[in-house]
Amino acid sequence: MPKIIEAIYENGVFKPLQKVDLKEGERIKLRIEEGILDVIKKYQGKFKLTEKDIEKFLEERR
């Protein structure tokens, strides 16, 4: 069954931010997705959005 966990990438290694139920050496597949804030930063300046617009957008998705 697929699970979604957050991880941080440090020194060439993905480190989960929560406990995972895996055996040592077990192989898994990772799907890398950008967080919404990463996407906003990436396109910042390409669209005319105010901070208020961004806050409203994020609030609607919570």
Curated annotation (Swiss-Prot):
Keywords: Toxin-antitoxin system
Source superkingdom: Archaea
Cystine bridges: none
KW Cytoplasm (keyword) present: no
Keyword rRNA-binding carried by entry: no
Protein family per UniProt: Belongs to the UPF0165 family.
Function: Possibly the antitoxin component of a type II toxin-antitoxin (TA) system.
Name the record gives this protein: Putative antitoxin AF_1095
Species of provenance: Archaeoglobus fulgidus (strain ATCC 49558 / DSM 4304 / JCM 9628 / NBRC 100126 / VC-16)
